[in-house]
From Swiss-Prot:
Binding site for xanthine: 20, 27, 157
An annotated Gene Ontology molecular function: xanthine phosphoribosyltransferase activity
Entry's transmembrane regions: none
Protein's recorded name: Xanthine phosphoribosyltransferase
UniProt cross-references to InterPro entries, sorted A to Z: PRibTrfase_dom, PRTase-like, Pur/Pyrimidine_PRTase, Xanthine_PRibTrfase
Originating species: Bifidobacterium adolescentis (strain ATCC 15703 / DSM 20083 / NCTC 11814 / E194a)
GO BP of this protein: purine ribonucleoside salvage; xanthine metabolic process; XMP salvage
Gene3D superfamilies to which the protein is assigned, alphabetical: 3.40.50.2020
Catalytic activity reported: XMP + diphosphate = xanthine + 5-phospho-alpha-D-ribose 1-diphosphate
Family designation: Belongs to the purine/pyrimidine phosphoribosyltransferase family. Xpt subfamily.
Record-linked Pfam families: Pribosyltran
Amino acid sequence: MKELEERIVQQGTVKPGNVLKVDAFLNHQCDVELFDHMGAAWAEHFKGKTIDKILTIEASGIGIACVVARHFGNVPVVFAKKAQSINLDGDQYTTTVYSFTKQKEFPVIVSKRYLNEGDHVLLIDDFLANGKALKGLIELCHEAGATVEGIGIAVEKGFQGGGDQLREEGYDVDSLAIVESMDPENGTIEFRS
């Protein structure tokens, strides 16, 4: 998606350790109009698929997922929580994932009330690096008996291989911007064509 790539080049910052900072418009301050355009792009890509639920992971995916849901008939958005809390009651699906950004493992939890057998789920997230978070969400869907219809990613770090691995496993991954390489010394970002 050219618009997203242009925003990344204009407002993104390449940091050491393969970190791409896009907090000016994607995952701290949110550009809702951009999210709306992203939703339209995913609605076009996943046209013809039954989507009756969107699943993401807290926190950065929530804003994107809520705007995207409007393009799929206002389907419910469920977000996996990263920590147990007193608000989470009843039966739950739980797995553990490794966060590239946070450099640690954490639990991801979804109430069994909100992820059900027979659901047709679109996974949405802001970033895809090594794919561990998405694999955790996929595991939760499989445990629930839900079908993963597709995966919508704002920014994929193509050089980290997670997206390619998910595609090889048969998942329909639509990344709107795939970063092929980044250089923190001169700030350059190259996209996959």
